[in-house]
């Protein structure tokens, strides 16, 4: 979706994202980011790039993600600098996202820098560059040129889905550590394509949480956020609450839980009785998110992710699906509730806010 906004609206979005007033809550900055993503264009690339000076790794990681999803080559120099990280200001989570964004844009000119950092000392960066190279090479191939993305999932994925197959075969490829990561990612996204209603596919994906790669585990959590399947809730909670789990995995698990905005199969179907180790604590998922959002000893990325996830949860369960930037929705006082689509919860809330502008191009 691409929309046109007035200079005043663009200024409001920019000020919100960049925290010009100095007191903008993180979840509002996230929503402004995804509203800017819906607008697109060179000016948005410049605004989002400016945000990479922010001290929050969580926000910078999301900024890099959006730069990739915009598919604008204007972002290539910025993303390359973040990956190179000459001043040491960007952590591995942000650098990984910059590499993934280069893969998303898919420019052949990005191959040399991605190949260079396939030798990086950080595993997540190395692996991301490997996958990004695989994606660009695939996109440039004859097979890639004939491959169409799944229209049910409006995102630029790190790897195209594998050819349709049965779940056991895809699960075998997903878990086969002797295969290239790019091939395993293709199996991962093919399992995603079975949809939220396939318990077997969700459980196959959840088995991937046992993998030794934090990058691999974090991508599964991201996919669960897209699917919004109640079947994924127990495994996501397990990742979030595991203090030994990598921060980037816990971050994705938190945001996925916020977007799912449900207490799972048992709450939606009272006749279903879950095993003891899959039952929710008192207060449900939201209570867990609230606990970690204020936990003093939680890593900053995890704590901030839970704060954003709480906002996502509240949005998904809101009767009016509000837009915090009220001035941008004044053109339409009432709007039908936006249907849930296969995007992350934060992006869904931004899409609703953009729709409320009533100016979709």
From Swiss-Prot:
SMART domains: EZ_HEAT. It catalyses: [eIF5A protein]-deoxyhypusine + AH2 + O2 = [eIF5A protein]-hypusine + A + H2O. It is found in: Cytoplasm; Nucleus. Pathway: Protein modification; eIF5A hypusination. Its main location: cytoplasm. Fe cation 2 binds at residues 218-219, 251-252. The keyword Iron applies. Binds 2 Fe(2+) ions per subunit. HEAT-like PBS-type repeats lie at residues 59-85, 94-120, 183-211, 216-242. The keyword Cell membrane does not apply. One of its GO terms (molecular function) is deoxyhypusine monooxygenase activity. Its cofactor is Fe(2+). Belongs to the deoxyhypusine hydroxylase family. Catalyzes the hydroxylation of the N(6)-(4-aminobutyl)-L-lysine intermediate to form hypusine, an essential post-translational modification only found in mature eIF-5A factor. This is Deoxyhypusine hydroxylase. It comes from Cryptococcus neoformans var. neoformans serotype D (strain JEC21 / ATCC MYA-565). The lineage of its organism: Eukaryota, Fungi, Dikarya, Basidiomycota, Agaricomycotina.
